Amino acid sequence: MSRFPAVAGRAPRRQEEGERSRDLQEERPSAVCIADREEKGCTSQEGGTTPTFPIQKQRKKIIQAVRDNSFLIVTGNTGSGKTTQLPKYLYEAGFSQHGMIGVTQPRKVAAISVAQRVAEEMKCTLGSKVGYQVRFDDCSSKETAIKYMTDGCLLKHILGDPNLTKFSVIILDEAHERTLTTDILFGLLKKLFQEKSPNRKEHLKVVVMSATMELAKLSAFFGNCPIFDIPGRLYPVREKFCNLIGPRDRENTAYIQAIVKVTMDIHLNEMAGDILVFLTGQFEIEKSCELLFQMAESVDYDYDVQDTTLDGLLILPCYGSMTTDQQRRIFLPPPPGIRKCVISTNISATSLTIDGIRYVVDGGFVKQLNHNPRLGLDILEVVPISKSEALQRSGRAGRTASGKCFRIYSKDFWNQCMPDHVIPEIKRTSLTSVVLTLKCLAIHDVIRFPYLDPPNERLILEALKQLYQCDAIDRSGHVTRLGLSMVEFPLPPHLTCAVIKAASLDCEDLLLPIAAMLSVENVFIRPVDPEYQKEAEQRHRELAAKAGGFNDFATLAVIFEQCKSSGAPASWCQKHWIHWRCLFSAFRVEAQLRELIRKLKQQSDFPRETFEGPKHEVLRRCLCAGYFKNVARRSVGRTFCTMDGRGSPVHIHPSSALHEQETKLEWIVFHEVLVTTKVYARIVCPIRYEWVRDLLPKLHEFNAHDLSSVARREVREDARRRWTNKENVKQLKDGISKDVLKKMQRRNDDKSISDARARFLERKQQRTQDHSDTRKETG
């Protein structure tokens, strides 16, 4: 199990005192050290205390700027106080009298932690005057005046209240991250003001906040709105390129040892000050924590450390799936004589401000979701960060004093491999969910929606195609009754389809735990230590065996049910090497999904179906109903080919219970793909062809022009030909033609399969006969 946070150092007495000190601090409901705030803070009108920020000198001016403009762009260095102080200023200026002040964040961790911090500064209980809402967790009330939320939650608000009548101010924070949902919110808010709806509040204000972005472009998009710059420089940060990664290493992200070495060198050779290390994800972070702890334990603090005031190193991981209490620890000051080292994902680059950081180690990579046109799927990839992200990271070292940033890559890597700015998510990921949302908002022409950066038309057409395959839209591109139901679920469309199919068969109990487990981080703990690794793998195999050993989806359901029914779920998770925090989140998700299904089944026109068969077959049939795009057929040996027209080869992931049984399988359905040395299918179960026989043809029925809902009167014949040519070119690029499609369909029907089996048996019988004749001749 993970031992972190942990202190590595000399003098057990000193270490134990430090741990007791930290435990006492954790008993306080605080995200920052209250004593530290009071020492250097100032008093707000609410009677609380807040740190000193550059924005405080601009308080009156920025309040007036919000009053005078429908749209306002606010920019300033990270740590200038935009996120925590501006909503408070607007509240104290009376803006909340006309509705809530809504503040969006791209990540749920940031939304929760910032809400906690502001609630403390305003001396109120979290969920009362200050609250938050993230997916599956709403900590707000009728009393809430300042509401922090993920951008996805605001999009859900707009579905139920297109004119945002419950809000007086909308603040879109961290706009420079260019998440898919934030870009859609840009367009919706612009459209709301352009249409001048009689139901829209005249006093609604929109503030877009960004640390680094193309501000002139954003201002032009919002009608040349003013840009309010918060002056205030950071302390100087000295940068050093460590030259451990060059342009040739772009695809090689096995750099953990280098990161740990640089971090340890800082601890041994630099004066007091905390360290912030940037890595890409949970596995890398936990592995680095283990390696760093082992190295720090061997340090002789009498001879090895230049700063004689140091007695140890406090190692703290930080990533999205951690519990709120675990995340809170990174904000607390370390015990006396202890240096703090936070090893984090990109969340600490912009969304969270950690006091005391003097040294930053920039790993140079980030996990990013990219659409793979060959596979037709979104793939989570490790890619080089942009130059603007790198500057954000280094800025963390100059918040409270001068600092240093150690970039493990070379200057050539900076120049050749790192783009200037973040590529907007809308230009590189699937648009299926947001296109469905736009359709449900009666925005039918999604191609000519006001995008800040228009996405590739192919991504839009791919989204329309998938929605049509799920029956969320009809042949004309209009949203169906099923589509209106699907948009209520905070799940991907294909998973929502599977859940609704199960509900129609009155067996949602089979699917809801699985849907909940697929909505949280990976629940399996895979330790770095080889001895613990073997034990964990054995426990995981035992859990898979209880599910029949032949269905990864069912394994997730077994884990959910067994943990929930155990008397001590946290202990059960520890014994079976399962992340308890992920299971705890899954329990909450399942309860909310169950409530959505309950309301859906109360509708008089909800479809009802019957099926008589074993539970395991019902489960797999429901999965086929939603995941038929992710169906694959065995090709050669252990390789499977997808049936979506691309024929992409995939392999079953080694973590699957079916990994050693590929040659026994003919047809599978999978949850997602992972690209490493091969393209792997993750979370797999076997299926029968007859379960998807009637579904697979839908993968090839697609009329781009009709589904796009472009107004017919505005489209001439040459435009129609353009749509048709695009589809023909796409099919040629994918290596598939109409003749091939027909052959595939013929190949997969019952008669073809029966004929192929007969030919195989005939050849086998002929070979046996020939072999027998040969033996007679030689005998």
Curated annotation (Swiss-Prot):
Summarizing the function annotation, the protein's role is:
Probable ATP-dependent RNA helicase.
Location of the Helicase ATP-binding domain: 63-231
| Start-end of Basic and acidic residues biased regions | 13-41
Pfam families, from UniProt? DEAD (PF00270), HA2_C (PF21010), HA2_N (PF04408), Helicase_C (PF00271), OB_NTP_bind (PF07717)
Which amino acid positions bind ATP, per UniProt? Answer: G76, N77, T78, G79, S80, G81, K82, T83
> Region (Disordered) spans which residues?
1-53, 737-779
**InterPro entries in the record:** DEAD-box_helicase_OB_fold, DEAD/DEAH_box_helicase_dom, DNA/RNA_helicase_DEAH_CS, HA2_WH, Helicase-assoc_dom, Helicase_ATP-bd, Helicase_C-like, P-loop_NTPase
Q: What is this protein called?
A: Probable ATP-dependent RNA helicase DHX40
Q: Which UniProt keywords apply?
A: ATP-binding, Helicase, Hydrolase, Nucleotide-binding
Q: Where does this protein come from, organism-wise?
A: Pongo abelii
What Gene Ontology terms describe what this protein does at the molecular function level?
Answer: 3'-5' RNA helicase activity; ATP binding; ATP hydrolysis activity; RNA binding
In its keyword annotation, does this UniProt entry include ATP-binding?
yes
What's its EC? 3.6.4.13
- SMART domains in UniProt: DEXDc, HA2, HELICc
Give the reactions, separated by semicolons, that this protein catalyses.
Answer: ATP + H2O = ADP + phosphate + H(+)
Please list the residue ranges annotated as the Helicase C-terminal domain: 263-442
Q: Which family does it belong to?
A: Belongs to the DEAD box helicase family. DEAH subfamily.
- Motif residue range(s): DEAH box: 173-176
Source superkingdom: Eukaryota
Could you tell me where the Polar residues compositional bias lies?
42-53
